[in-house]
Amino acid sequence: MKAEKSTPLTQGCRLPKASEWQFITDLSEPQDLRWLTLKKCRIIGLTGQTGAGKSTVAKLFAEHNIKVIDADSIVHKIYSGASVCPKTLAAAFGNEVLNLDGTPNRPRLAKAAFSSKENLALLNSIVHPFVMYELLLQIKSEIAKGTETVAYDAPQLFESNSDLICDVIVSVVAEKSVRMQRICSRDGIAPEAAE
């Protein structure tokens, strides 16, 4: 595909390289993603560590009529038995990471994925493209509705390369002690478990 001329609307934006999101280019032709450079919708990337206050900022965005797309909700959707993602996870980590209904068994998947850096990288290399594809579908749907601004709430915004489609990045930060207190309160766990 030829590089498009940069316009004020697309300045600073680029289409993802095929090597970055091979899964997406496998499912759609490059011209099908051209709408990303022509979008009339501002995309805000919202990220930060757990307990920093991303959910609070996301609620503020929603209160100001900014459509919020939540990465965790997308993961729940792609983990459904109807998605190809669980089968791909089983091929990588073994069938024991799936429940009888074909959905991932999160504790078993976490145990397998967090057993090594390589396995965690493998998990991310499988899940992130599925999440990105669904995110792009949702953004395209919002653009069709005339939505002017979308916020994408994603703890792994940079790790998944989702930042590449964002016009603005908002990173929510808080002191570690504040985050630990919030995590303990939110999840009902002891401070040692929050570490």
List the predicted regions and their residue ranges.
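ATP-dependent small-molecule kinase phosphotransfer cores
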Residues: 73-148
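P-loop (Walker A) phosphate-binding loop of NTP-binding proteins
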Residues: 49
